[in-house]
Amino acid sequence: MEWNDKGFLIEKKRYNENSLLAEIYTENHGKVVGLIFGATSKKIKGYLELGNFLHVNYKYKNDNKIGYFNVE
């Protein structure tokens, strides 16, 4: 499954070397937790500050498992 939405970054935790476990409050789907791969890269690091407004693409394989975000 996949969906696109807008939301605010409300929590982030470091996961492995270059990923984040992020909690985003979205307009249509509420509070969603997912991984952001490559979150420590120079290109995306500036966008991932708490409270920032983000356009996200969320992909997941199963409703019971965590998915991952692509941030725009």
Predicted region positions:
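A surface-exposed, charged beta-strand/loop segment in the N-terminal or early-internal portion
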Residues: 1-72
